[in-house]
Amino acid sequence: MTDILNCTKSEEIFSAAQELMPGGVSSPVRAFKSVGGQPIVFDRVKGPFAWDIDGNRYIDYIGSWGPAICGHAHPEVTTALQEAIEKGTSFGAPCVLENKLAEMVIDAVPSVEMVRFVNSGTEACMAVLRLMRAFTGRDKVIKFDGCYHGHADMFLVKAGSGVATLGLPDSPGVPRTTTANTLTAPYNDLEAVKKLFSENPDAISGVILEPIVGNAGFITPEPGFLEGLRELTTENGSLLVFDEVMTGFRISYGGAQEKFGVTPDLTTLGKVIGGGLPVGAYGGKKEIMSMVAPSGPVYQAGTLSGNPLAMTAGIKTLELLKQEGTYEKLDAITSRLIEGIIQSAENNGIAIYGGSVSAMFGFFLCDGPVRNFDEAKTNDAKLFGKLHREMLRRGVYLAPSPFEAGFTSLAHNEEEIDKTIEVFDQCFNTIKNQ
């Protein structure tokens, strides 16, 4: 690991990519617009490490944005995939692997009695929204400022006070008529949710949220918040939906609902359950899921849904996670990391607020607490950009945005954690004087 990395090939490839793909990327955050500097182009990944096309090695705390909880290219996962690929890459028909992964998900996640596999978290959230409306016969849905549920039109609603509840679109091309039924509230604010129910009697199909917000940084639920949502939705004949695409199988084997002891009506999943391959899922009570076609009238379909390679990687990943001591290790290393980051910042006189839950962590460069998206936006984005660039040039790969959670894996050991803390200390010392 060196202090200054040569990224000439990355620069050349990214320059060419900008003529071929919008912004040079297949997903916006990868373009480094939030942090400045030049994106790196990956060549390979293994364990807790990533190597770019120039041969530089990084300690990786993105993990493909969450799926790589066992570490990149875990040998048991890759071996299983090598065996599976000999049988074909896609069936477009039922296969026993779907049954096996479905049974594992149902056994693990408290709310899930029946599950449908799709191809992404966005797909899962799109489908669950349609199902919420069909089951309740109501059109409106409550989401929270800063919570991300994929790029479907209904969820791309501007966050913030004033315009939030008016349903103004957050992207050109999204009609106001589409978002008019999306109501928003600040995360961790039960009174705001009560007000929305009061103002929209018998009109709200349900409440959807990230039980731990990972797409506005890292924000945890205040004591009583999730429990309060469960009570409010039940009282108003609405559904409670946990978007566990990020938290599912990451913060505990049964996800956030197991961790916090609050069971929603429906759950969306993704990332970890595909072991690094494209996948999503939604599930819940049989009474609700039985409305999904072909059992019921709520249509949803997909050419690659239940793909045998994704099912194979997911099964092996969950088998690894179910082993004794898995989440204890993840909690220990992640706690060690965030405590070291916070201590390093404080030692250098830099304001910081952060935390972790199992294999998920985050921090804001501001005074805390951070309980919602408005408070998250007090983060010093300019300073974070400087920090990100300094960390990168010293071989530590953080999410290129102050509004994304970080991830550890079973492949991260004390050696990588301690080296990372050392690099944070160096970088905080550097940027405090810039």
Curated annotation (Swiss-Prot):
The modification N6-(pyridoxal phosphate)lysine is found at K271. It comes from the Bacteria. It is an enzyme of class 5 (isomerase). Pathway: Porphyrin-containing compound metabolism; protoporphyrin-IX biosynthesis; 5-aminolevulinate from L-glutamyl-tRNA(Glu): step 2/2; Porphyrin-containing compound metabolism; chlorophyll biosynthesis. Its cofactor is pyridoxal 5'-phosphate. The keyword Cytoplasm applies. Keywords: Chlorophyll biosynthesis, Cytoplasm, Isomerase, Porphyrin biosynthesis, Pyridoxal phosphate. Homodimer. HAMAP family: HemL_aminotrans_3. PANTHER family: GLUTAMATE-1-SEMIALDEHYDE 2,1-AMINOMUTASE (PTHR43713), GLUTAMATE-1-SEMIALDEHYDE 2,1-AMINOMUTASE 1, CHLOROPLASTIC-RELATED (PTHR43713:SF3). This is Glutamate-1-semialdehyde 2,1-aminomutase.
